[in-house]
Amino acid sequence: MNLLLKIFFIIPIYYSVTFAQDFSKIDKDLSDLNFNKTLIQLEELNNLYPNNKDILLRLSITHHYLSEKAIQQKEDKENAQKAFKYIDHAFSLNSEDPNVLKWYVIALGKTVEEESIRKQIEQSKKIEQLSLKVIELLPDDEFCYNIMGQ
């Protein structure tokens, strides 16, 4: 087989298959609140695979939690913006994935906190509409109901 063919087709497929194994460790680090460790691993993967929605989703989640635990407002805002940037990219790749949609709503809600009242009202309609869709797709996910204040 041609070496170039292997490099462009076989090797990326191999690494795509191994992602599921890598995600279990990353997900464990996320659940253990090791956000900085997780971020380093995810950024390395994202450099290799910039259009992988699973990597983008986890990058968004990581930045969301870094934003939530930030002490300084500047750090909070920067991480919230990064969280939205990553999930917006994942959303553009697959807007029907329930977890992508859930975290899109969360990140959007966080970023509108800094907007004008008018913009917040406009975005709240979009957030409500998307939240209802997320609840429909993930009816057992308590986080979804929390988004809607239920």
Descriptions of predicted regions:
Residues D29-L42, D76-Y86, Q120-K126:
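Helix-turn-helix repeat elements of alpha-solenoid scaffolds
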Residues K6-S16:
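Bacterial N-terminal signal peptides
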Residues Y65-K74, K110-K119:
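Short coil/turn linking the two alpha-helices of tandem helical-hairpin repeats
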